[in-house]
């Protein structure tokens, strides 16, 4: 089985996640057997020391010894965590991030996950109340970023691997923390699955079938959603929800979930998706609701839904631009201002006026091309600027005299010049990562 899986890959570079336990040990020896028949195959191993057990260093030394014995290059890395909650999940994420950093572009990561692991994962997903996507469990092949992970033992039981290890007298280690039933996975492994297997010997195989069915259903659903959502994603990657009130609630929630999945973050819970629908999609047009997901916000503006990274408040920041021959860096990755011939045309400052940039403005103003003063809030709305971006636009001041929102508008002033000289202009460009929408004449990150 494993040989058939390995031989289907043209690139013959493999990195084995090697803990020293029986599963990864069988994987290591199986790969050595395959390499004997296919010398072009190149194998490396990586061992992650979690530093959770007094014997952690001995296990690391064991892995090094075995790899040296069979002339397999090995990488060893230590990871530490400070959190005491969600230890299993935190370690898993940190372990994969570490492995990813050492995985070569053309290299395939091999792990020793087996059918029992798949069943445990299924039960953990059931405990969390997961839907079909979560119940899909692990797949034999998937991608970590752009790099491939393969689990060649996923259809094999733990007993089958133990039998092979015993028949071939393999040296492996036993992590006794795997027997600590305070951990959810261990509780399922030692207290739940043995009883189910005793009652129904075919139970593990049927668990695998369930994950396959859920994966197929998820894939089919995503094909439908991908086709449908292409017409709903705007130029700035926001989601057009104008017609959501005319669409079935379940379809709306599925579209929201799929849209969020494109952001490469951990998928929010069912409850969170429900909140997004009820509190944002179904809210009044003039409301400004938001849902926080980790370090991001889901917000609505007019007929679109936005996924925004939470940023620091810079509304009280003042920047003085003393030397306009040099560019002025703006905070929070907002780019920079530069004087050039391609920029926004502005009246030049008077002598002794200090050029400064701010990010907050209140009250009424009169802009060039208008006859009446209007509240700044109304002007932002006219320019289609959502509330969370209004304190991100550089505002040009000469001393305390407001001149312009760079790239948007200029203040209308009555210029009294006793010497009747023509007022000079200069040009400023705001170089940034903002997308300009000429049709709706503004910008979203």
From Swiss-Prot:
GO terms for biological process: tRNA modification. Keywords: ATP-binding, Cytoplasm, Ligase, Nucleotide-binding, tRNA processing. It is found in: Cytoplasm. It is an enzyme of class 6 (ligase). Its EC number is 6.3.4.19. It comes from Buchnera aphidicola subsp. Schizaphis graminum (strain Sg). The gene is tilS. This is tRNA(Ile)-lysidine synthase. GO terms for molecular function: ATP binding; tRNA(Ile)-lysidine synthase activity. ATP binds at residues 19-24. The N-terminal region contains the highly conserved SGGXDS motif, predicted to be a P-loop motif involved in ATP binding. Belongs to the tRNA(Ile)-lysidine synthase family. Its main location: cytoplasm. Ligates lysine onto the cytidine present at position 34 of the AUA codon-specific tRNA(Ile) that contains the anticodon CAU, in an ATP-dependent manner. Cytidine is converted to lysidine, thus changing the amino acid specificity of the tRNA from methionine to isoleucine. One of its GO terms (cellular component) is cytoplasm. It catalyses: cytidine(34) in tRNA(Ile2) + L-lysine + ATP = lysidine(34) in tRNA(Ile2) + AMP + diphosphate + H(+). HAMAP family: tRNA_Ile_lys_synt.
């Amino acid at each position: 089985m494993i040989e058939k899986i390995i031989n289907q890959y043209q690139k013959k570079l493999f990195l084995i996640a090697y803990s020293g336990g029986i599963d990864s040990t069988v994987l290591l020896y199986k790969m050595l057997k395959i390499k004997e028949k296919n010398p072009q195959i190149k194998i490396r191993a990586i061992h992650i020391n979690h530093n959770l057990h007094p014997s952690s260093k001995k296990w690391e030394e064991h892995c090094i010894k075995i790899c040296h014995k069979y002339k397999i290059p090995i990488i060893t890395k230590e990871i530490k965590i400070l959190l005491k909650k969600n230890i299993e999940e935190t370690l898993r994420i940190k372990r994969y991030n570490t492995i990813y950093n050492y995985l070569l572009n053309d290299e395939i990561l091999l792990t020793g996950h087996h059918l029992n692991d798949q069943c445990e994962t299924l039960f953990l997903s059931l405990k969390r109340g997961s839907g079909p996507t979560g119940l899909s469990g692990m797949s034999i092949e998937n991608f970590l970023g752009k790099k491939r992970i393969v689990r060649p033992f996923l259809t094999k039981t733990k007993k089958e691997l133990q039998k092979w290890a015993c028949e071939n007298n393999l040296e492996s280690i036993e992590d006794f923390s795997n027997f600590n039933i305070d951990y959810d996975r261990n509780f399922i492994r030692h207290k739940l699955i043995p009883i189910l297997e005793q009652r129904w010997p075919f139970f593990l195989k049927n668990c695998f079938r369930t994950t396959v069915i859920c994966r197929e259903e998820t894939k089919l659903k995503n094909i439908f959603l991908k086709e449908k959502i292409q017409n709903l994603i705007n130029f700035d990657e926001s989601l057009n929800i104008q017609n959501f009130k005319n669409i079935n609630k379940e379809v709306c929630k599925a579209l929201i979930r799929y849209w969020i999945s494109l952001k490469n973050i951990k998928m929010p819970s069912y409850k969170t998706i429900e909140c997004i629908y009820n509190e944002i999609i179904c809210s009044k047009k003039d409301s400004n609701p938001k849902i926080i997901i980790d370090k991001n916000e889901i917000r609505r503006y007019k007929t679109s839904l936005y996924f925004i990274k939470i940023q620091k408040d810079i509304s009280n920041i003042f920047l003085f631009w003393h030397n306009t021959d040099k560019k002025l860096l703006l905070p929070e990755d907002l780019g920079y201002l530069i004087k050039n011939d391609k920029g926004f045309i502005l009246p030049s400052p008077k002598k002794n006026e200090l050029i400064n940039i701010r990010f907050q403005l209140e009250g009424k103003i009169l802009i060039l091309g208008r006859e009446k003063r209007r509240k700044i809030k109304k002007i932002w709305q006219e320019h289609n600027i959502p509330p969370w971006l209004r304190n991100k636009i550089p505002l040009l001041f000469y001393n305390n005299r407001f001149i312009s929102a760079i790239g948007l508008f200029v203040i209308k002033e009555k210029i009294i010049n006793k010497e009747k000289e023509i007022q000079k202009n200069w040009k400023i460009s705001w170089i940034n990562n903002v997308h300009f929408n000429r049709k709706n004449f503004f910008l979203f990150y």
